[in-house]
Amino acid sequence: MKNLRKLKENSNCEFQIPFAPYGGLFLHKDLIGLIGYPNRKYFVYADDFEYTNRIQLLGGKLILLSNCKVSDLETVWHSKVSKCPFVSRYLNQSSFHTYYSTRNNVYFSRKYLVNSNIKYKVNMIVFLFAMIFVAILCMSFKRYVFLIIAIRDGFRENLDEMA
């Protein structure tokens, strides 16, 4: 909260962050020799977070410059508006987006962010119960099953590409 107030008061703030998207990322070429290249197993989605997280793990710093503006060439895939007002981005997108973004985020979160497996699993159960109600309201049962498969593969550390 303190950093949020600081950001509102001064638009020229710098914040240290644990990981970042590729968009707007600047790094010295020698850093690539230390951290290597992005992990191909992620294929798409969360590969940028895993890659930049390695900088932090090796003692480096990622600094967010709040006064810089980045124009992204790609549109955000989960910004589509749904006909069902309760729909989640997890139940409204293509199978490709749903599967890889969910699976990779589950894998990344469990590997690098989770401090308590019990809390994580309880949170996951609550999330899945909420999603089943959304699936019922929006008639998205197949998408819900696909979401569960993606979560299962993330838990099992299965980062193979789908056929």
Predicted regions located by residue number:
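Core nucleotidyl-transferase/polymerase catalytic module
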Residues: 1-4
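A recurrent flexible, glycine/aromatic-enriched loop bordering the glycosyltransferase active site
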Residues: 7-27, 89
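A short, conserved alpha-helix in the catalytic core of glycosyltransferases
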Residues: 25, 31-36, 41-68
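A structural signal for well-ordered alpha-helical segments within the folded catalytic domains
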Residues: 49-50, 96-103, 145, 149
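Active-site donor/metal-binding and catalytic loop motifs
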Residues: 65-89
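A short acidic, glycine-rich active-site loop
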Residues: 85-99
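Non-catalytic, C-terminal membrane-associated alpha-helical segments of glycosyltransferases
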Residues: 111-163
